[in-house]
Regions:
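Short turn/helix-capping motifs enriched in Asx and small/polar residues
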Residues: 1-74
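Acidic glycine-/aspartate-rich tracts in secreted/extracellular proteins
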Residues: 4-6, 33-34, 122-123, 175-179
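Active-site-proximal loop/helix of nucleotide/amide-processing enzymes and allied scaffolds
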Residues: 11, 16-26, 146-207
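A short, charged
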Residues: 50-84, 155-186
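A structural/positional concept
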Residues: 97-98, 116
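Short consensus segments that form the blades of beta-propeller domains
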Residues: 103-109
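Short beta-strand scaffold segments in enzyme catalytic cores
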Residues: 112-121
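Short, solvent-exposed aromatic-acidic interface loops
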Residues: 128-139
């Protein structure tokens, strides 16, 4: 549903999408036989009013690729809406797959993106990833601790659960690759003003 902020996944995935830089919407352009989704570059043909895939050498042909199925859907909007993505199990993306998407999306739009990984109370494995909208995010690392949009509030209406009904495993936000390493590798902890996903992953690898 267009106005539903909860991501309704396409169980088949394997599609090509166009990203609208102005509105923040992803538009399904073509269904393919690929195992993963991708976001391709398009331009508006002023004569026909239709979007055409970029093919010339000076045009961006691929904006994002290797996106696990179940993350993107037609008209989903991460810019203006918070979204919840169900992870794990058949036909669903993995936590790592969603993290990869968030990092690449953050780089593509040039803004920080934050969210939570959580499960039902008492469940040890993450079952959902809550991605906060990035409409008001900043790309200035000196303001990382004042940028509220990089630390989204948990919205029960969108999540379908009250905060006391879930266990929060991770809260995260991204730091753009252009940031200095001192900013990108701040520790990430629950409800603390720090933490890039890159640091979180490094700790997991060393743990």
């Amino acid at each position: 549903c267009k106005n539903n902020p909860v991501n309704r996944i396409d169980p088949d995935g394997m599609d090509d999408y166009r990203y609208d830089d102005k509105t923040g919407q992803f538009h399904l352009m073509k269904q393919t036989d690929d195992k993963t989704d991708r976001v391709l570059g398009y331009h508006l043909n002023k004569k026909t009013g239709e979007y055409k895939q970029n093919t010339k050498w000076h045009q961006t042909k691929t904006r994002m690729e290797g996106i696990e199925k179940g993350i993107l859907s037609d008209e989903v909007n991460f810019k203006e809406n918070d979204n919840v993505i169900s992870v794990g199990g058949e036909g669903k993306p993995t936590v790592t797959g969603v993290e990869n998407f968030v990092i690449e999306l953050s780089e593509m739009v040039g803004l920080e993106i934050g969210g939570f990984e959580y499960s039902k109370k008492g469940v040890t494995e993450v079952s959902n990833v809550y991605i906060g909208r990035y409409q008001s995010s900043k790309d200035n690392p000196s303001r990382w601790n004042t940028d509220q949009r990089a630390y989204p509030s948990f919205n029960p209406r969108i999540a379908g659960s009250m905060p006391n009904e879930v266990d929060f495993h991770v809260d995260f936000h991204t730091h753009l690759s252009k940031f200095p390493e001192s900013d990108r590798l701040r520790p990430s902890g629950l409800y603390t003003p720090g933490g890039d996903m890159e640091y979180k992953r490094g700790q997991q690898s060393n743990g």
